[in-house]
């Protein structure tokens, strides 16, 4: 059984045995290509959370209404991406074997690959819903196949054509967009099409993995990330998207790419905390009063 963590995200005080959702951190940013620091994201979010209320006025629910366990951060090998991914995969697989939903806190976006490996093994026919400024579909980055710039390409090799659904994408090489046109479902710039996709996935009850790169947010509200891109969505747009997609059969999720030291104001860390609170509440299916259809923007 996974041991308790000393410093937990606020409101995540359930025992492991009782938990429906298990939060686990991957403080890894060894393939960062521009501005490093995402490895400090998980600890910064936990520390900052003590200035945040457990209650969400957006969803009229409280984190303490649910059974959520924070297992803390994995001790990862910074010198080997594959070793780090193997450790992430093993932790996700353990959580899944115990009948719980794994929620990974990064870290750079490459960490998603470890979790997806485990979730796809447990849930054949997996779909991936991807919120990000970047396509992350390069076949390699400077010769490296395991890079944050290639993570969705590696995920495609696991789940196959038509099962990766990308939103808010506004940056990438021409080759990435050409690849997407043939192999993924890409929705550029915003969340247009998400509601329709969610309805389809609800009808089929197919398993879904949700991966959120926080640089989908506009740098005006979230500058503390390794590769900021102008033209992003707002916090409220992201929250509405999370609430929408949570209607689907979500079997795993992650939130990544906060680099807290790149925003000395602390605004980015505070925003990431709030996104995580809303994500945890939205994913927990135990609250019967939650109505995703209620718009907040």
Q: PLM ranges: what are they?
A:
Residues 1-297:
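Conserved alpha-helical scaffold segments that buttress catalytic/binding sites
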């Amino acid at each position: 059984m996974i041991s308790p963590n000393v410093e937990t995200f606020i409101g995540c005080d359930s025992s492991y045995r009782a938990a429906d959702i298990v939060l686990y951190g991957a403080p890894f940013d060894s393939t960062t290509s521009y501005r490093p620091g995402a490895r400090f994201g998980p600890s910064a979010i936990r520390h900052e959370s003590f200035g945040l209320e457990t209650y969400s006025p957006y969803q009229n629910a409280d984190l303490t209404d649910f059974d959520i366990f924070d297992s803390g951060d994995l001790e990862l090998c910074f010198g080997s991406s594959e070793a780090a991914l193997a450790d992430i995969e093993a932790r996700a697989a353990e959580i899944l074997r115990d009948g719980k939903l794994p929620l990974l806190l990064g870290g750079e976006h490459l960490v998603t690959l470890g979790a997806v490996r485990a979730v796809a093994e447990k849930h054949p026919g997996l779909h991936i819903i991807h919120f990000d400024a970047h396509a992350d579909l390069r076949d390699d980055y400077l010769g490296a196949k395991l890079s944050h710039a290639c993570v969705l390409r590696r995920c495609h090799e696991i789940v196959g054509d038509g099962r990766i659904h990308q939103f808010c994408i506004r940056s990438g090489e021409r080759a990435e967009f050409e690849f997407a046109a043939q192999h993924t479902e890409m929705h550029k710039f915003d969340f247009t099409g998400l509601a329709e996709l969610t309805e389809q996935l609800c009808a089929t009850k197919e398993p879904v993995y949700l991966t959120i790169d926080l640089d989908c947010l506009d740098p005006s509200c979230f500058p503390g990330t390794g590769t900021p891109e102008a033209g992003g969505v707002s916090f409220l747009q992201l929250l509405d998207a999370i609430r929408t997609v949570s209607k689907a059969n979500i079997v795993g999720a992650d939130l990544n790419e906060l680099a807290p030291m790149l925003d000395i104001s602390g605004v980015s860390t505070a925003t990431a905390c709030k996104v995580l609170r809303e994500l945890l509440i939205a994913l927990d299916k135990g609250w019967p009063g939650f109505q995703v259809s209620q718009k907040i923007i």
